[in-house]
Amino acid sequence: MPKIKTKKAAAKRFKKTGSGKVKHFHAFHSHLLGHKTSKRKRRLRKSAIVSKGDMKIIKKILPY
């Protein structure tokens, strides 16, 4: 049986942490920022952990 291929689009967007969790960056922070508050833009700068509900899908598309 062949190895499962990694989805390269997902590999660019998600990183696995040492403890096995998956980290991602927030959307909505590349352009059209004039009407967004400073607080909102500051929060969007930081990375976040993928929720438990999405982990099943992420593990399937990022097997290694």
From Swiss-Prot:
GO terms for molecular function: structural constituent of ribosome. It comes from the Bacteria. Keywords: Ribonucleoprotein, Ribosomal protein. Pfam families: Ribosomal_L35p (PF01632). GO terms for biological process: translation. GO terms for cellular component: cytosolic large ribosomal subunit. Coiled coil: none annotated. Belongs to the bacterial ribosomal protein bL35 family. PANTHER family: 54S RIBOSOMAL PROTEIN BL35M (PTHR33343), LARGE RIBOSOMAL SUBUNIT PROTEIN BL35M (PTHR33343:SF1). This is Large ribosomal subunit protein bL35.
